[in-house]
Amino acid sequence: MKASKELLQKRLYKSNQVLNANSPFVITDEILEHHYHAFQEPWGEGEKVILQKEDIMQYSKEESKAIWNQNAEFWDCAMGDESNDFHREVVRPKVTELLNPDPTDYILDIACGNGNYSAYLAEKAVSVLAFDYSEKMVELAKKRQKRYADHIEFCVADATNETSLMALKRNKPFTKAVSNMAVMDITDIKPLFTSVYKLLEDNGVFVFATQHPCFVTLTEKYMTPHSYYDIAIEGQPQKQCYYHRSLQDIFNLCFDTGFVIDGFYEECYFNKEIPDIIIVRAIKIEK
């Protein structure tokens, strides 16, 4: 017998796969049908719900890019100039605290979306190079943020391709780099971390926020990197690709690349005892 939506909501507390401005954690019937198989087992006088992920597959960056191009207009409208409540209340404050932007900075904005965080930095007189691998998203970002053209340069680049990333190098190194909720959307993050290290000045700062792999990815295969389809904002045209990695995979990649982590937050939204995201500050050190 299928478990009810109410039982799953009680069991899970939240689903961070559905985010909108006013109701960030909603388990929809579509998600239940598409993503989870629920089985009943005896549990005293009640019921116990066991969740299992659907078939684990590796979705390609080409599939992911096509989906983001299809979702771009919806995403631009949904995030707007100021982003949604989740980003404004949970992501942005600690990201900005760790990034500590200054007018003297030259910041790389990774997977910039419609550019609203780049605009936030530009308001602080920061110079920004912002990129995304969705051509449609970059087109919309340029249009939406055209009033900041003197502070923001928008580019199309592939975060999984070191050659594409190193083409972002300009006459001066970046002082800082930032990624707001994008690491979980990227097929292979090793080229990104390697390139960011090379593009940053000595002692440069890399701040990234991503889904908390312990509490958000609803899977029994925590230690195994894998990918799956889900939605980020309710009503988006296409489900996007997510890429799960354990904390040790993420942290060890930082260390192996040459970064030292000197700032870390676990931030909550719906349930104040269950963090939805991690925010990491990594400092480039000489190898």
Task: List PLM regions with ranges.
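Conserved class I S-adenosyl-L-methionine
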Residues: I50-D102, N116, Y120, L140, V207-I233, ...
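Class I SAM-dependent methyltransferase SAM/SAH-binding core
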Residues: Y106-T163
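A short acidic, Gly/Pro-enriched loop at the edge of an enzyme's catalytic core
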Residues: L165-A177
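A short SAM/SAH-binding and catalytic strip from SAM-dependent methyltransferases
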Residues: T175-I189
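A short glycine-rich, Lys/Arg-flanked "PGG" loop and its adjoining helix->strand segment in the class I
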Residues: K190-V205
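Short alpha-helix
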Residues: C241-F264
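Core SAM-dependent methyltransferase catalytic element
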Residues: T257-F259, E267, K272-K287
